UniProtKB/Swiss-Prot annotation:
Record-annotated C2 domain positions: 488-616
Name listed for the protein in its UniProt record: Active breakpoint cluster region-related protein
Biased composition (Polar residues): 54-67
Gene name of the record: abr
Domain spans labelled DH: 93-286
């Protein structure tokens, strides 16, 4: 029996005395494991610290100048004067990031030291007649902690002197690369983590001495700190390596962001990031006790695996829901409306045990509920309104008289518009079915997102799942826990972003999808490309199908327009030709996703003039691609052709005069071919053609090749459509002319229908005859394409969106003014260009002869 004190608790044995007499130094660390600093917070917001937890922002400890093992000064001590060069700014930011790394590493090492401190005394007692723990229990609890401590101690000791003598020639990439290569030790720790917690808990229940030790571990702080060591539990410290490794990529992203691409560190940091990301993807399923809700029927912790906002079709209307995927069930909830100041709560709409959840096959699935589709023009009009509000907010911020109340009012309105867009833009169906007979329908914005949810659910279903039924109380507890457990806190809309967050890229992304490897069997393979815009993803391009191969080589180039985009997604499909696998919603054959991946569009990388090569790894498959970005100001430049014998880049009047035609031959032939075999092609004019095919057609038209008709008959129809778009884009001036640009902008803005009709018809009459004849010829063609909208999915508004900004653009003189304004104002102009073309597309047939005979009610000079 253990000796008991007068208070009824066991007296301290020699192990307690040894433990309590240890010299810890000083620190500030609260019981929740959050480091707090009493020193000034000046400059902390400018420093990209790598936090230990969401609520902490560790600063460097103050060191004496003669301290050998000191770290770099705080940000306020190293800020450069206001006139520093770009290289100086980059150097400063790198040093600040690395200083943050050192501060974070010092805290982490101190935590590991505190965790390891009782291990040696415990081992010493293990061989005595009264052991506190057995050697096996000690090894189970402290498994791999020593190895993790040593690798971080070595990293810290080598990084510290480098940061103290930091300049633009300093290299640290090798240290991060080595640290990343040692992450395997974390895998062993993670695999043992749950067992270590269980062992520690059992030992605490059986042994009062160990209970006292595990509840009162002392964590010292940075050297020279005057604060006392803080008490932390063993359970909290055992979680630190889990928390640390899941954040291992953050600092690498920060360093890469502020490291020039030609710096020796850049490839090493990229390699370290790749290793870290691959490692994290292999352990992301492991248990996180902070995301544990309640226990499953088998007594295991129920963990949140995935959550996000989806649009559900319920009672023939769209509802925004928050979907929570736990290890054994799927729960659909809605956020309750609460008054200001009250705690927000979720209301459970339904749940399905994963054991009862099935995905109906295309032939088995019932048709999607009848729902009024939102017209495309309403979606585009809402985007235009959002762009206008964004520009107004920016104007208010720049104005000296801009009031916060006005900005908040504008942001509130923008939130309403974006919420509407998020609710009514998704169109891709996602069905889940309960074995008991109930079906649920969601609408998603991209196939990538649908695949993520399906794969996450199917992965969990491979485990030994048991049927379950939650009692009302259990359901209430689980639903109440969702608010704290959720990982997605806000709907993905712009108004939720901080003011200093990247607005994304505006312009054109050129992507070459080269090849893919890693397929286990020969298949018919193709890829699609998605980019984000206004908070959701849209499919932008599709490669051709490479048949019967394990190593497809597409080598296809696409030009993708970006509207505030920050991410590129690539999906790889196996083409299915089995007509029994039809999607009942649109009679399209459902192809199988073989892999998917995404990459952040880092402006520093993609905005370089050179092509950037990259690889996306997905389910063992590697897709190689290159990309290059061109900004909107570059896309506005129209370079006249040096060879006046061709057609591309040559004035339309010169071409028609040479050909003795009213409409250029290239326009007539491309339109004829599209109407012959492409008018029912899904996404005609919207889906990008292969760049190499388009360039081949361009060269043939420029050379007036005799084989052009043969080429057109053999060429992919999207390449022909792309050639027509390229011709209009490369005209020395847009088809509707530079001179009339502002007049078209003013005309479409008129409110009175009669005045608008007068103005818009007069503007057409003001065009040169070749331009007018070509425009009317194209107009009738686009109307015929739109007549097939039920098949080709191309409405008048879709076609106006594709051709409007090409046929009507500001001159280079006017565009220079646009480049000095916010990208949202430019975007607003694009919407107006779309509206101009849409006006003529929706207008009754316009005859050239009648138009020329007509006169205005009022004579005006444009």
């Amino acid at each position: 029996m253990e000796p008991v004190s007068h208070q009824g608790m066991p007296r301290l044995s020699w192990i307690d005395t040894l433990y309590s007499n240890f010299n810890y130094g000083t620190d500030g660390y609260d019981a929740e494991g959050n480091e707090e600093h009493k020193s000034s917070r000046e400059g902390s917001e400018t420093m990209p610290y790598i936090d230990e937890s969401p609520t902490m922002s560790p600063q460097l400890s103050a060191r004496s100048q003669d301290s050998v093992d000191g770290v770099s000064p705080t940000p306020t001590e190293v800020l450069l004067p206001g006139g520093e060069s770009e290289s100086d700014k980059g150097l400063l930011m790198r040093k600040l990031v690395l200083s943050g790394v050192l501060a974070s590493e010092e805290i982490y090492i101190n935590q590991l030291e505190a965790l390891l401190l009782p291990m040696k005394p415990l081992k010493a007692t293990a061989s005595t007649s009264q052991p506190v723990l057995t050697l096996q229990q000690i090894n189970d609890i402290f498994y791999k902690i020593e190895d993790i401590y040593q690798m971080h101690k070595d990293f810290y000791d080598k990084l510290c002197p480098i940061v103290l003598q930091f300049d633009n020639k300093t290299t640290v990439g090798h240290l991060f690369q080595k640290l990343a290569s040692q992450l395997g030790v974390y895998k062993a720790f993670v695999d043992n983590y749950k067992f270590a917690l269980e062992t520690a808990e059992k030992c605490s229940q059986c042994n009062v001495q160990f209970f006292k030790i595990s509840e009162d571990l002392k964590v010292k702080g940075p050297k020279d700190s005057k604060e006392q060591p803080q008490s932390v539990t063993m359970e909290a410290l055992l979680y630190k390596p889990i928390d640390r490794v899941t954040r291992s990529t953050l600092v690498l992203h920060d360093l890469l962001k502020h490291t020039p691409t030609d710096h020796p560190d850049y490839p090493l940091l990229q390699d370290a990031l790749r290793i870290s990301q691959n490692f994290l993807s292999s352990i992301n399923e492991d248990i996180d006790p902070r995301r544990t809700a309640v226990t499953t029927p088998k007594g295991e912790p129920r963990q949140l695996v995935k959550d996000g906002f989806l649009v559900e079709l319920s009672e023939n209307s769209r509802k925004l829901r928050h979907l929570f995927l736990f290890t054994d069930l799927l729960l659909c909830a809605k956020l309750k409306k609460t008054t200001v100041g009250k705690h927000q709560q979720y209301d459970c709409k339904w749940y399905i045990p994963l054991a009862d959840l099935v995905f109906p096959s295309p032939e088995e699935s019932e048709p999607i509920p009848q729902l009024h589709a939102t017209p495309d023009h309403e979606i585009e009009e809402m985007k235009a309104k959002i762009s206008v509000l964004k520009s107004e907010i920016q104007k208010e911020r720049k104005s000296n008289k801009g009031s916060s109340r006005t900005i908040e009012r504008l942001k509130k309105k923008m939130f309403e518009y974006e919420s509407w867009l998020l609710l009514y833009s998704p169109t891709i169906p996602f069905r889940i079915h309960n074995k008991n007979g109930k079906s649920y329908f969601f609408l998603l914005s991209s196939d990538y997102e649908r695949s993520e949810w399906r794969e996450a659910i199917q992965k969990l279903q491979k485990k030994d799942l048991q049927a379950l039924a939650l009692s009302p109380f259990e359901l209430q507890v689980l639903t109440a826990s969702c608010f704290k457990l959720r990982t997605v806190h806000n709907v993905p809309i712009i108004s939720h972003k901080d003011d200093d967050e990247s607005p994304g890229l505006y312009g054109f992304l050129h992507v070459i999808v080269k090849s893919a490897k890693g397929f286990s069997h020969s298949s018919n393979l193709y890829c699609t490309l998605e980019v984000d815009s206004f908070g959701y993803f849209v499919s932008k391009a599709k490669t051709r199908v490479f048949r019967d191969t394990t190593e497809p080589e597409w080598n296809e180039e696409f030009e993708i327009e970006l509207e505030g985009s920050q991410c590129l997604r690539i999906l790889c499909y196996e083409k299915c030709y089995d007509k029994s696998k039809l999607n009942k919603d649109n009679n399209e054959i459902v192809d199988k996703i073989m892999g998917k991946g995404q990459i952040q569009l880092d402006p520093q990388v993609v905005q370089s003039k050179n092509w950037h090569d990259d690889v996306i790894e997905m389910n063992g498959i590697k897709v190689e691609f290159s990309m290059k970005f061109s900004s909107r100001d570059m896309s506005l430049k129209r370079t006249p052709s040096k060879k006046q014998t061709g057609v591309f880049g040559v004035k339309i009047s010169v071409v028609t005069k040479r050909e003795r035609s009213k409409v250029p031959y290239i326009v007539r032939q491309c339109i004829e071919e599209v109407e012959k075999r492409g008018i029912e092609e899904v996404g005609i004019y919207r889906i990008s053609g292969v760049a190499t095919d388009i360039q081949a057609l361009k060269a043939s038209f420029d050379a007036n090749s005799k084989d052009i008709l043969m080429m057109l008959s053999d060429m992919d129809i999207n390449a022909i459509a792309g050639t027509l778009k390229l011709y209009f884009r490369e005209l020395p001036e847009p088809l509707l002319t530079d001179r009339l640009y502002l007049a078209f902008m003013e005309g479409i803005a008129l409110s009175d229908p009669a005045a608008k009709e007068n103005c818009m018809m007069h503007l057409l009459r003001s065009l040169p005859d070749p331009n007018l004849m070509t425009f009317l010829f194209l107009l009738q063609h686009l109307k015929r394409v739109a007549e097939k909208e039920p098949i080709n999915k191309m409405s008048l508004h879709n076609l106006a969106t594709v051709f409007g900004p090409t046929l009507l653009r500001p001159s280079e003189v006017e565009s220079k003014g646009h480049m000095n304004l916010a990208s949202d104002i430019w975007s607003h102009d694009v919407m107006a260009q779309v509206q101009v073309l849409l006006y003529y597309l929706q207008h009754p047939p316009i005859s050239f002869s009648e138009l020329k005979r007509s006169t205005l009610y009022y004579s005006t000079d444009v």
